[in-house]
Amino acid sequence: VSQQGIGMTSQRTRERLIQRLMDQGITRFEVLEAIRSVPRHLFVDEALAHRSYEDTALPIGYGQTLSQPYVVARMSELALAKGRPKKVLELGSGSGYQTAILASLVDEICAIERIKPLVERARKQLRALRVRNVRLRHGDGLDGWGSEAPFDLILGAAAPEHLPTQLLEQLAPGGRLILPVGGERQQLMMVTATPEGYVEEAIEEVNFVPMLRGVSR
């Protein structure tokens, strides 16, 4: 198959995906535009490239998945709910797809991934897409990135059992944590740092891979 053939097919299937996201209630133009312009097929194994623009989660190896586009879009809309965040901490960046989407929506991203080969893969793809406002680190997301705190937004694509206090402590005043929380049953939580303390809001039921402690080489 020629590159052009792949390109034309992916353009058509991308538009179909955008339409599906709109049908599911995703309305923010900049989020839809980011999903339209970021080539999702670069972030999955070649064998799965033909499924890149389906609205489904896809395996990326190491027991990890590339989040469903609807979930990426929903998290991105929530990220922008209080305006454009300047400094963002992303936990569990995987192969870098959500990172690439967010990069056009925020000023600066610090991204952490615990699996070393995925860090290298994400770095390579982000470089290929000329994404310049992301710093990527191999580390334990549950520790956050204290030396870069505070953050206007902390966003995670893996679920800890409980809200991690050390992450809440890295929020700027008025900053928000958007994270799936729980075991078998998970809730997407949004926690805002206010002068009176942390205000928690359950958004919807979700299903993410668990957020694990430690790092993996």
State what each model feature region is:
Residues 2-89, 97-101, 105, 118-132, ...:
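Class I SAM-dependent transferase core
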Residues 80-199:
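Conserved nucleotide-cofactor-binding alpha/beta core module
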